[in-house]
Amino acid sequence: MQYQAEIPYGAYWSTPFARWQGSFSHLHSIQFAAHVAKAELAARAIDTSVFDYGALGFSVPQKHAFYGLPWLAALAGIPQIGGPTLMQACATGVRVLFTAAQEVQAGLASCALAITCDRTSNGPHLYYPDPKGPGGTGSHEDWVVENFGCDPQGGHAMLQTAENVAARHGIGTAEQHELVLRRESQYRQALADGSAFLKRFMTLPFQVPDAKFRKIAATLEGDEGLTH
């Protein structure tokens, strides 16, 4: 199947990467994504009235995440759009793009906002009531660390997936090291000439807001926490 949906050149962006418990750890991911989207759309002089659909993806819920895409869109100054909120673990980003493209392809929308966000630092601790449990007590879950540590379908930690793929397809350590070195080389190229490649889709220096989005809490010159 051929898709007619297109991402206009330059109509995409990303924040820098921030390490675990780093410069973004105090921010609400949905509010932060809306804050960034509003600024990036304005910087590109994109009229928000052109949007008639949206798709949001995240894998870690936060307060008021129940309201999903419509809430984020309203915060970003695009209150007229609706759309789904999607969650598919590590495939969430791909699913969001696919969903937005399908909507346009089917003629149900003319311009879609595809947006993803997450904050793995300080993930939620959830309690699931169980009236039939001992004394009426339920079960609990540390959303991020417990799901990283065990995929209930596969019965193994998330980190084990790569090892399983390598074993199944006979990818040896030497080949893996070649890939690591290639990615290292590509990242160094992205940092060349004052991060010229990254600046094609990333606003640098990047001003990190405080939790209330009123003041500048920090400034990032690029990705945080990567060794190269």
Where are the language model's segments positioned?
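Short, well-ordered amphipathic alpha-helical segments that serve as non-catalytic structural scaffolds
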Residues: S29-A45, G68-L72, V96-T99, M158-V165, ...
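Active-site pocket-shaping loop/turn-to-helix segments
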Residues: S14-K38, P61, P84-F98, S110, ...
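Short acidic, glycine/serine/threonine-rich loops at helix termini
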Residues: Q21-G22, F66-Y67, N122-Y128
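Conserved catalytic cysteine-centered active-site region
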Residues: F58-C111, E141, P152-A157, L226-H228
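Condensing-enzyme catalytic core mediating Claisen C-C bond formation in acyl metabolism
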Residues: M1-L27, E141, A167, L226-H228
